[in-house]
Design a protein with these regions (language model features):
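Extracytoplasmic
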Residues: 15-49, 66-70, 232-240
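Cytoplasmic helix-loop-helix junction between adjacent transmembrane helices
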Residues: 111-148
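Conserved MFS/SLC helix-loop-helix module at the cytosolic interface between two early adjacent transmembrane helices
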Residues: 67-106
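Extracytoplasmic gate region of multi-pass secondary transporters
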Residues: 34-38, 215-267
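Short hydrophobic/alpha-helical segments at membrane-entry points of transmembrane helices
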Residues: 104-112, 217-218
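Juxtamembrane intracellular "pre-TM" segments in multi-pass secondary transporters
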Residues: 3-10, 190-221
Length: 270
């Protein structure tokens, strides 16, 4: 059997990176699609400002639940990556669009939670998928995917900055992007020359890993960083919108669009 060429010479590696980066860019817009139009939802359902953050928080909770379930069920090894990604993206697109059918905040939060669950099959699998195409430059490839999904999360704010883009256009644009991501991966992705061997979930290793001081410190640092980052991403757009309204009460929709454009730039910068 002829060994595969080294990853810095494989002819299809950059195509795979471009395809997965574009898929993440399109698919991750589901995350903040509710937050981008939170002021409109608040006016529609008459909930307090304290509840606005839940439109994003429940997505994160759903993502955590979905990731944990995926790990326990070993989905990344049981289900082919292309299928897992595509089905998750389609499910997320549907759950996100169904928010438009909600008549009150609790129903919307349920759909947003399910959206987060589905995103657990869009974000983590893509990192494993691209790693099968790279070895020496794996860090560059994974970093590119993370950068693409970061910009993708910010896209709903860019859509909201377009004149006339309210709740339905922003929500449906995010769902359409996720469907596009599913189509890209389903039709265009193939596993790379460096696949990972399937491994069952090993309960016996949980205590061993959790007992490692370096793992605990690294995990605590990562959790703290993510807490800070997502709190800032949720707070900043609301802060910008409130600042514009306080500075120029007559700005109206134009000021809201300007705040969304700045929010997009800030979130996309990471």
């Amino acid at each position: 059997m002829t060994p595969p060429p080294p990853d810095d010479a494989h002819p299809a590696r950059w195509r795979a990176l471009l395809l997965l980066a574009l898929a993440e860019l399109l698919g991750m817009g589901l995350w903040f699609s509710g937050s981008a139009v939170a002021p409109q939802y608040r006016a529609l359902w008459h909930f307090s400002a304290e509840h606005v953050g839940w439109l994003t928080t429940v997505v994160s909770l759903g993502f955590v639940a979905g990731t944990a379930a995926s790990a326990l069920l070993n989905l990344a090894d049981v289900v082919p990556a292309r299928r897992l990604f595509a089905l998750s993206a389609v499910g997320g697109a549907a759950a996100n669009a169904l928010v438009l059918t909600a008549d009150a905040l609790p129903a919307a939060l349920a759909w947003r939670f399910l959206t987060g669950v589905c995103l657990a099959g869009v974000y983590p699998p893509a990192l494993k998928m691209i790693a099968t195409w790279f070895r020496a430059r794996r860090g560059l490839a994974v970093g590119t995917i993370v950068g693409a999904l970061t910009v993708g999360k910010a896209l709903p704010y860019l859509v909201h900055a377009v004149p006339g883009a309210g709740v339905a256009p922003v929500t449906l644009a995010a769902s359409a992007g996720a469907l596009g991501a599913a189509a890209l991966v389903w039709l265009g992705y193939a596993e790379g020359p460096y696949p990972f061997p399937p491994r069952p979930f090993a309960w016996g290793l949980v205590g061993q890993i959790a007992g490692a001081p370096r793992w605990r410190r690294a995990t605590a640092g990562y959790l703290g960083r993510m807490w800070e980052l997502y709190a800032a991403w949720t707070w900043l757009p609301a802060f910008l919108a409130a600042g514009v309204a306080a500075r120029d009460p007559a700005a109206g929709a134009g000021g809201e669009r300007a705040a969304s454009a700045v929010a997009f730039a800030a979130l996309a910068a990471g």
